[in-house]
Amino acid sequence: MARSSGPLCLLLLGGLVAGILSGASADGNGLPSKKLKMQYTAGPLLKFQICVSUGYRRVFEDYMRVISQRYPDIRIEGENYLPHPIYRNIASFLSVFKLVLIGLIIAGKDPFAFFGMQAPSVWQWGQENKVYACMMVFFVSNMIENQCMSTGAFEITLNDVPVWSKLESGHLPSVQQLVQIIDNEMKLNVHMDAIPHHHRS
């Protein structure tokens, strides 16, 4: 039974590696593509820093579409809001560790014997159920990695001036709120530009 599961485990590992490499190709660190969208037009810069792993990319694209129609001169940028380096390092470590662990399970190598320790019962179970063990390692590791990379952020700045922070407010702005904020900021900028500047002779 264990021998017959070998080819299936190898096929599973190949699929997992291919999926990881394809995800890593979006960004050098295996993260989602940092740069989401940029419109090259002259004008104010509206920048979004969002948690891509939280599913906010679709929200960003919807907001971008509405704002682009209403303010065609505004440049819009979006990028992934990266978590603290500690959490990024944990996620990077797990992405490698799970492949090593899956490889050991498939190869039937006992890492505990290298340290002169007796293999725990969970390792013996993994050797008897390699397919399930590989899937469990992969999905549990992915769950922890996603948790480490999820910041919940949806931060918005206009010309580097913060105009909205989900980390502070606890919720996303509605389209109406965002449009009102941009309107107010644009009017304020126009008003400031209209104020005459007196230069000392």
From Swiss-Prot:
Q: Which GO terms describe its cellular component?
A: endoplasmic reticulum; endoplasmic reticulum membrane
Q: Out of the domains of life, which is the source?
A: Eukaryota
Q: What is its EC number?
A: 1.8.1.9
What this protein catalyses is:
[thioredoxin]-dithiol + NADP(+) = [thioredoxin]-disulfide + NADPH + H(+)
Location(s) in or outside the cell: Endoplasmic reticulum membrane
Q: Where is this cross-link: Cysteinyl-selenocysteine (Cys-Sec)?
A: C51-U54
**Main localization of the protein described in the UniProt heading:** endoplasmic reticulum
User: Posttranslational modification, per the record?
Assistant: May contain a selenide-sulfide bond between Cys-51 and Sec-54. This bond is speculated to serve as redox-active pair.
Q: Where are the transmembrane segments?
A: 96-116
Uppermost EC category: oxidoreductase
Whether Ligase counts among this entry's keywords is no
Gene3D superfamilies associated with the record: Glutaredoxin
Give the residue range of the signal peptide: 1-26
Which Gene Ontology terms cover its molecular function? thioredoxin-disulfide reductase (NADPH) activity
Q: Does the keyword Endoplasmic reticulum apply?
A: yes
| PANTHER family with a match to the protein in the record | SELENOPROTEIN T, THIOREDOXIN REDUCTASE-LIKE SELENOPROTEIN T
Its biological purpose is as follows: Selenoprotein with thioredoxin reductase-like oxidoreductase activity.
Q: What protein family does this chain belong to?
A: Belongs to the SelWTH family. Selenoprotein T subfamily.
Q: What is this protein called?
A: Thioredoxin reductase-like selenoprotein T
UniProt lineage: Eukaryota, Metazoa, Chordata, Craniata, Vertebrata
